[in-house]
Design a protein with these regions (language model features):
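Small-residue (G/A/S/T)-rich helix-start motifs and N-terminal tracts that mark the onset
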Residues: 1-124, 131-141, 146, 151-267
Length: 267
């Protein structure tokens, strides 16, 4: 349930997380997001997360993968860079199975996580990378839905159903944030962000977001914002919660605009 530490996120809050480039900026100073997303089972996640990242105003997207996934990403976004190099933030796990040894290709995707673990830049963990929550030294944001959060908590000997989490997202997001020392963005019809004892509540999401792939798009948007805000986040880790909420807010607003367009087309 909501308490005195919970506040509602607004468009003005989101605007404060948008870094506007200056005449002195270049592609590196505008933020570089390293992506380890997509797999043989879910190749679309690689394309969706990278494209969303680039559409959100990052200076560069570095996609890390085998040649097959890289070709798919480059076909949709030729400006993406598919060589390892310096990054200002990481996004990992979208479209990757959480069971590392489920098959050989998934194992290979998990091996890329070593790159991320060796650095100290802000990191976003989604889907198959959630098990790393609490194991990294850098500022970390996790973006689970209720089912993924239930599985993560079970790995820490806390038994709770996804239905219970959905019924009280604020409590469970807070508990997870405090347990693991990370920022938690718990996805749902009412998305919440928890950091320590602070909670940010997002406006109710449009049901048009209840489709496959929207989580990958959200991850890309948030990853881009984290990459562009990396200096602010390293100076003040509390900024990570604001940036995460801004990503969810932008994601929902984009979906609302897109759904209005579809409604007009059907008339």
């Amino acid at each position: 349930m909501a308490d005195k530490n919970t506040r509602t996120f607004t468009s003005r809050d989101a605007a404060r997380c948008i870094i506007v480039p200056s005449d002195l900026d270049h592609k590196y100073s505008r933020g570089v997001l390293g992506l380890i997303t997509g797999s043989a089972q879910y190749p679309g996640a690689a394309v969706l997360s990278t494209s969303a990242c680039l559409a959100t105003g990052v200076g560069m997207a570095r996609f890390h993968s085998s040649s097959g996934l890289a070709h798919l990403v480059l076909h949709d976004a030729p400006e993406a860079v598919v060589q390892p190099g310096p990054v200002t933030a990481w996004l990992a796990g979208s479209g990757i199975h959480h069971k590392k040894y489920s098959d050989f290709t998934t194992y290979l995707r998990h091996r890329w996580f070593v790159l991320m673990k060796r650095q100290t830049v802000p990191t976003v963990l989604d889907a198959g990378a959630l098990y790393l929550a609490g194991k990294l030294s850098q500022p970390t944001l996790i973006t689970p839905h209720a089912g993924e959060l239930a599985r993560l908590l079970a790995s820490h000997s806390i038994s709770v159903s996804s239905e219970s989490i959905e019924a009280d997202p604020v409590t469970w997001a807070q508990k997870t944030a405090q347990l693991l020392g990370v920022t938690v963005l718990l996805k749902g019809s009412r998305t919440v962000v928890a950091q320590g004892d602070r909670v940010i509540a997002l406006p109710k999401a449009t049901p048009y977001l209840a489709t496959a792939g929207t989580g990958d798009v959200l991850a890309g948007i948030i990853g881009a914002l984290v990459a562009t805000n990396y200096i602010e986040i390293l100076n003040s880790p509390q900024r990570l919660a604001e940036v995460a909420a801004a990503g969810a807010y932008i994601h929902n607003q984009a979906a609302l605009l897109a759904s209005l367009g579809r409604s007009e087309e059907r008339r």
